[in-house]
Amino acid sequence: MALLTPQGVKEVFQLQRPQGRERLRRLLNWEEFDEQRDSRRSILLDTLYESIIFAVGKGFPWVEVAQVVKFTEELLRETKGCSITEAVTILGNKLRDYRGHFNTTHLLALCDYFHHTFIRHYKLYQYVLGQDQQVDLTVAHLEVCMPPHPLPLAEGMDRDLWIHEQQVATLTEAEAQKRADVLLLKEALRLERENSLQKAFAAAAPAQPGQVLERQELESLICQAVHTQMELLQELLQRQIQNTFAILDLKLQKKTLNLNAPTPIPPPITSHAGQEEALKPQRASKGKKAKARK
């Protein structure tokens, strides 16, 4: 591990946690790694970073803070694969070795820190840092869409009233569509009539220019034109009647909805004049009761 300087650990501490961890990684000369896939290195970096936070919190000088990081890294490396009894022995030996770097108070604080963190959770540290782990990680990137900003409460309405207005709007739209269907049907039948008559006239036209149609042929052509006109008119009337009944049914539904419309909630009375208006019926009632008693 690269030897940290007092200035280096000071820079790490003064940064926010994410930036501080990144600065510590650079000072340790570690290569960049995937925090999610390389959990071992991520936890090791967390442990070293937390040792800096602990030392500064206990008032260690910056020189001793750098030594605490070195102490932590050596302890984790030397206890790899050891039993907890061996780990306690190694911790005691290292504390004695570092007596020249820390005063008695800081040495006791360091001993207490590792007993309550490293030794207490020793099996977990060994499992994470001492064994190769097979990582099977699936990463999914989700796009979170924020809900739209709600309108001011004063512009809102009662839920039942809103549902009623939506139902009325749906019926109104359906009625308008029915009326549009009638206009489209008239136009379609008109075009069909013109096309049918044009075909009939073209078929009955004389072969030679200037040739006059016989009376029988002319009567047949007129009958055919009248028959075509009557068929299309009958279809138009039938469709119009159907649409008229459908429109009347929609109007009846709207009328029924409006008769059963929910009563809107009146706005709260906030002004002095409004409060006076609201109190008038109560005052009148009290006056009548007083007169009755007399």
UniProtKB/Swiss-Prot annotation:
Renumbered to this chain, region (Disordered) spans 259-294
Basic residues bias (residue ranges): 283-294
Q: Note the InterPro entries from the entry.
A: CLAMP (IPR032727)
Record protein name field = Uncharacterized protein C8orf74
Native source organism of the sequence: Homo sapiens (Human)
Q: Which gene encodes it?
A: C8orf74
